[in-house]
Regions:
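Selected transmembrane alpha-helices and immediately adjacent juxtamembrane segments
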Residues: 2-46, 132-181, 188, 211
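Structural signature of hydrophobic alpha-helical transmembrane segments
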Residues: 11, 45-60, 107-115, 152-159, ...
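Residues within membrane-spanning alpha-helices of integral membrane proteins
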Residues: 12, 55, 111-115, 119, ...
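Alpha-helical transmembrane segments of multipass membrane proteins
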Residues: 20-24, 39, 66, 93-97, ...
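Small-residue-rich segments of transmembrane alpha-helices in multi-pass membrane proteins
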Residues: 42, 47, 85-93, 118, ...
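Membrane-interface alpha-helices at helix entry/exit sites of multi-pass transporters
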Residues: 45-55, 77-83, 174-185
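Selective hydrophobic functional segments
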Residues: 53-106, 192-235, 239-242
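Transmembrane helix exit motif
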Residues: 63-74, 96, 104, 113-138, ...
C-alpha cells in the first residue's frame, strides 16, 4: 500500500495515541520509537517513510529534554560535549541520507534486525559494558569513534540508541547513569535534529500523520515525567522490554513470515 497523503479520523486518533505512548516512554526510559513506528505502518506508510515521520514527531520532546539538561552538560570521558555534538550531527546527517537512499523493500528486511539490536541493548547492554569495563581500558579516541557510529545509527533508525549510549558511556567514559543523562539527551536531540533536516528536505515526512503524533508526544512526555516519579523503575523497564519485544516479533513476521 502506498503512503497516504490524507488520513481519516480513526488513523489520526491512532497516531495521536501512539505519539502519547511514545512520548511517555521516552520520558520514562526511552524506546518511544517502538510505539510510534508500528502505528504509522498500520495506517499504510512504508517502513522508511514511517521511520522518518516518527523521527520528526518525537523531535520536539527530545529537544525539550535536551534544553532542560543544558546546565548540566560537561566533558564526557575527557572530550568536550560540543565536539561530541558536532560529530553526532555530521554522523546523523550521514545516517539519514543512507535511509533516504535505502529502497523501501530493503528497509523492510533490515528494520527487524535493527529492532533486535535495540532489544539486545536493553536486555544486556549495561551488563556487557560492566564486563568490558573490568577488562579493557578505552580512551577518548574510542569514544569519538563510537559516538560517530551511534550518530549514524541514530540518523538511520534511532530505536534504542539512547539505551546503547547509556551502556557505552558507562564503559567509555566511566561515569554513572545519572551523570550521563545530560550528554545522552543532548546527543539524541542532535542526531534527531540532523536526521529531521534531511527527512523534511527530501519530502519523507507525512505531515498529516506527523502533526497529531507531535501533539500526542508532547502530551505523553509531560505525563510521563509526572508518572515516572511514582512508578517503580523495574516496572518501567519491564514495560519497555515488553513493548520492544512485541514490536520486534511483529516486524520479523511482517518481513519474513
Amino acid at each position: 500500500m502506498g503512503p497516504r497523503r490524507v488520513i481519516d479520523a480513526g488513523a489520526m486518533l491512532l497516531v495521536f495515541a501512539a505519539g502519547t505512548l511514545g512520548g511517555a516512554m521516552n520520558a520514562l526510559a526511552g524506546g518511544g520509537t517502538f510505539a510510534t513506528l508500528p502505528a504509522l505502518i498500520a495506517i499504510g506508510l512504508p517502513a522508511n517513510i514511517a521511520n522518518a515521520t516518527s523521527n520528526v514527531a518525537l523531535l520536539p520532546g527530545a529537544a525539550a529534554s535536551a534544553h532542560g539538561y543544558r546546565d548540566e552538560l560537561a566533558p564526557l570521558g575527557g572530550v568536550d560535549w560540543r565536539v561530541l555534538a558536532a560529530i553526532t550531527f555530521v554522523a546523523g546527517l550521514a545516517g539519514s541520507i543512507l535511509l533516504v537512499l535505502t529502497p523501501t523493500r530493503a528497509f523492510d528486511l533490515i528494520i527487524p534486525w535493527l529492532l533486535l539490536i535495540a532489544l539486545i541493548a536493553m536486555l544486556g547492554g549495561k551488563r556487557a559494558a560492566d564486563w568490558l569495563a573490568a577488562r579493557v581500558t578505552i580512551g577518548p579516541r574510542s569514544l569519538l569513534a563510537v559516538q560517530a557510529l551511534l550518530g549514524v545509527y541514530g540518523g538511520y533508525f534511532g530505536g534504542g540508541v539512547g539505551l546503547m549510549m547509556t551502556a557505552l558511556y558507562g564503559l567509555l567514559a566511566g561515569i554513572g547513569v545519572r551523570a550521563m543523562f545530560a550528554p545522552r539527551t543532548m546527543m539524541l536531540a542532535v542526531a534527531n535534529s540532523a536526521a529531521a533536516l534531511v527527512f523534511v528536505a527530501t519530502g519523507m515526512v507525512r505531515w498529516p500523520a506527523a502533526l497529531p503524533m507531535i501533539a500526542g508526544a508532547i502530551l505523553g512526555g509531560w505525563g510521563g515525567a509526572l508518572i515516572g516519579r511514582a512508578l517503580p523503575p523495574l516496572l518501567v523497564r519491564w514495560w519497555t522490554l515488553a513493548v520492544t519485544g512485541a514490536t520486534t516479533a511483529v516486524f520479523f513476521a511482517r518481513a519474513y513470515g
